[in-house]
Amino acid sequence: MGNSDRKPGLIKRLWKWWRTPSRLALGTLLLIGFVGGIVFWGGFNTGMEKANTEEFCISCHEMRNTVYQEYMDSVHYNNRSGVRATCPDCHVPHEFVPKMIRKLKASKELYGKIFGVIDTPQKFEAHRLTMAQNEWRRMKDNNSQECRNCHNFEYMDTTAQKSVAAKMHDQAVKDGQTCIDCHKGIAHKLPDMREVEPGF
């Protein structure tokens, strides 16, 4: 019996099977890719959902001991209707692409956490105005979209509002203003505002 009569080894047979496209090989690759994609997407979505919770937001003491305490005293936390807006409702866009962009930009906040930029109440207060202005700018740029997920000029019954509020809302619509133009500090203590243009 010569060498030519021997059956090829397992590795050679697998290599030949791999190199010779067949329906079975392509089907196997597609199945592996499909299952891998589902596993990746499921893990990615699970991670994103976990990172979009109030618990995640206050998991660092910088937030828990400062802005979260302020938020608990706000109408967004406790109100007559029982509807609560949590951190991601106001600070994370709902749409996929803007949400991903916001998550990437949040890496700067992670840098601040790691290197202790705002790890004491004094450091936090020293940076409060800059952090607030960054958030106000983001909200102004997206037309206060996170506010508008719950509040919308088009659906407001200004006749049911106090006269000063109705007047201001009507004027805001005429002037093309957005929520954050007037409602700064709605859920958190305002920073030293001497350098900031007043809302109303």
Swiss-Prot record:
- Compartments where located: Cell inner membrane
Q: Which residues bind heme 1?
A: C57, C60, M63, E109
What would you give as a GO molecular function for this chain, any one?
Answer: metal ion binding
The organism's superkingdom is given as Bacteria
Pfam families named in the record:
Cytochrom_NNT
Which ranges sit in the Cytoplasmic compartment? Answer: 1-23
**UniProt name for this protein:** Cytochrome c-type protein NapC
Q: Where does heme 4 bind?
A: C179, C182, H183
Query: Known InterPro entries for this protein?
Result: Cytochrome_c-type_ET (IPR051174), Multihaem_cyt_sf (IPR036280), NapC/NirT/NrfH (IPR024717), NapC/NirT_cyt_c_N (IPR005126), NapC/NirT_cytc_sf (IPR038266), NO3Rdtase_cyt_c_NapC/NirT (IPR011885)
**What's noted about post-translational modification?**
Binds 4 heme groups per subunit.
Q: Name one GO cellular component term.
A: plasma membrane
Binding-site list for heme 3: C147, C150, H151
Q: Which stretches face the Periplasmic side?
A: 45-200
* Primary localization class, coarse: membrane
Annotated keywords: Cell inner membrane, Cell membrane, Electron transport, Heme, Iron, Membrane, Metal-binding, Transmembrane, Transmembrane helix, Transport
Where, by residue number, does the polypeptide cross the bilayer? 24-44
Gene name of the record: napC
Q: Which organism is it from?
A: Escherichia coli (strain K12)
